């Protein structure tokens, strides 16, 4: 997918917000429920900055699993409190069969001048003939490089086109010359390391996320990644957001979601480069993150929800969103010359990632419902067993593939890119 076609709340608080609705007048704020921009500082930026000038809105956030449960409960009870929902493509897909989404072709028609790529609008149909969500914002995962690391690049290596072997060699050179392991990954409890394994590492070696989980190529991949991990800062197992170790100088080369490195780039833009993740034998895989806006079936304020979609997709709002929270426009919005250097770096990094000649697209998992956490755990458990505990690669892959098969059979989720389309549950060979 080319650049042109791409790109918690606490349950008690959420419950209180909803239970109060019965006694509030029709003039109350509409409820905008989102799985995105959940951290406290990001949610506050949405309320104070991004929603400025929009219809009066209560912005409520929740984790993906409770979000799905909440939406299902409202449908089953036929008692609707939520007007607008914001979530990832793969989180919106399961809402379709439960009848939780209202078709919004009328809203799509009013957005034709926004320049949202046709490919993204097609994704928003969720495989139907009707528009079910409007693309909201996009992001991906990148590598951030402190320029202090550049003198230690392996001979002949291009920082914008690295391989995993070169990354390991680079890390080894930095370790030998500085006495510290300078590579870093967010393997902490709230880190997004599972997305690295799913979206970057696995498809780069196997052209698959599920089907080839225990393949010979996967075995090679894990052995190669052991060499990368050997040069990674041991504190990586406690890192959640890589911007902190980057700013502290503990790590010079880090992988993470663009929103989780933004502060480091904003603080010292002249110190860093943002580059595409490394490539493996099957290409340079990356995971685009597409968030969408959908109107809930039975929305108490459908008109207000449509107006809020119009506000959030205005070019100026999209640029504010990029500047404030590091998610990039889906509309045709030219990045201004006065854009902060840190955000400009991120924009360049996203472009390098999406337009690499060997780019491979790996979509976020789709159709897993409340099994998404278990799916992620398969990858992290495999990493812990093979890399951290040094268990045999082949035996571990065989055992973990059984766990993966159980999850896919339970969810009946068909394959998604880069795996080939399947009839029924995505198979694990």
What are these regions (language model features)?
Residues 29-31, 47-116, 151-154, 252-253, ...:
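Extracytoplasmic "Venus flytrap"/periplasmic binding protein-like
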Residues 263-269, 281-381, 414-429:
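C-terminal lobe and pocket-closing loops
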Residues 88-140, 168, 273-275, 427-429:
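Hinge/lid segment of periplasmic solute-binding proteins
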Residues 38, 60, 236, 349-405:
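C-terminal capping/gating helix-and-loop segments adjacent to ligand/active sites or protein-protein/ligand interfaces
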Residues 29-47, 370-371:
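Extracytoplasmic "Venus flytrap"
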Residues 106-116, 159-160, 202-221, 266-267, ...:
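Short, solvent-exposed loop/beta-turn-alpha elements that line the ligand-binding surface or hinge
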Residues 169-174, 208-239, 277:
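Glycine-centered hinge/linker elements that transmit conformational signals in sensory
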Residues 128-137, 141, 165-211, 217:
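Extracytoplasmic/periplasmic solute-binding protein
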